[in-house]
């Protein structure tokens, strides 16, 4: 099975953005060392516009993911900037009951049975996985399907804001830390694998 990985930026107190979902306070920590990490380890998680701005180029191959799933709130950020396919270098899926028709041929809308679609994507053959881009609502809906967490923890205390998983009621899930890396600017990237009971 392919993995569903929630690769997400988070504050040290566990929020992925302020109460409105704005995560711009994290951007000041994206320095040369961190950009090199993204470029070599997770280049596909940088949008097409971000790749152009940062000089990645379109020829940088995907390393971990070939599919991205995001909720309407996350996707709307790109639409507001006139970008209907922010991750054109991957298969793009947007979970939305309100969007209707896709504004781009590379973007498939998932109107219902989100769990069924994700399980079908995970069952596909392939070496590259599925990136759960966010936001909090879709992460909450897919919490039980997440196989791996990659937390980019920024040295910022937000106090309140958007949680990593919205709408999840006291579901205890165990994960194992599989790797961690500390950057000079205080950012810590930790990777966790879900511990599932053997069937």
For each of these PLM feature ranges, what is it?
Residues 1-199:
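Enzymes that bind and transform nitrogen-containing heteroaromatic metabolites
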